[in-house]
Amino acid sequence: MNKFKVILRRFWKLILGGIIVFTAVILLSNYWVEQSAKEKTFSTIESIPYNPTGLVLGTSKKVRGGNINLYFKYRMEAAVELFNAGKIKFIIVSGDNSIMEYNETRDMKKALVEMGIPEDKIVEDFAGFSTLDSVLRAKEVFGQDSITVISQEFHNKRAVFIAKNHDIYALGFNAQNVPQRYGTVTITREYFARVKAILDVYVLGSMPKFYKDKEAFPNEE
């Protein structure tokens, strides 16, 4: 019985130690990303500098049940606000089109055109399967090494972190956040996404799934 208690005690110590390490990794990763993006994300038009190219990070247009996805809605509004204020000249809409029935990129372009953005100012990136793919393809595929990322603040910070570590000058324009009751799961996932971002940059050396074929980009003149 005493031997069993010793084994059980060691088992719980291992579990506790694992939880402590796991929590520390998440907190340190979050701090690392936050510091890397410090003073690189902006919430007002007046404060953000000009950058020729905006990069809208993709998300689904609608949520389950058919209602509009507020993350999508607010990102489109932020992109239009930037464009109309002359803070960007072109917009890359980068999203997932891995299956025929699901096309974030086309949905974003359609929404922006309906909101008054000229079609010739929008560039479609159909292979933005992840934040890393979208950010790195802006440079590797479209030749843009200076971008303004357009998403919610928590997402922008991770995108800026990724960009900074791949020699891309990136700012973030923070779209309106969604009410907390709708965004709890997304925010929780973001903590784990930041751990993955650090692994992608410093351990795995991850690159986009498709990035070797260059695509034309409009001339700024």
Question: What residue spans do the PLM features occupy?
Answer:
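N-terminal type II signal-anchor transmembrane helix
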Residues: 3-46
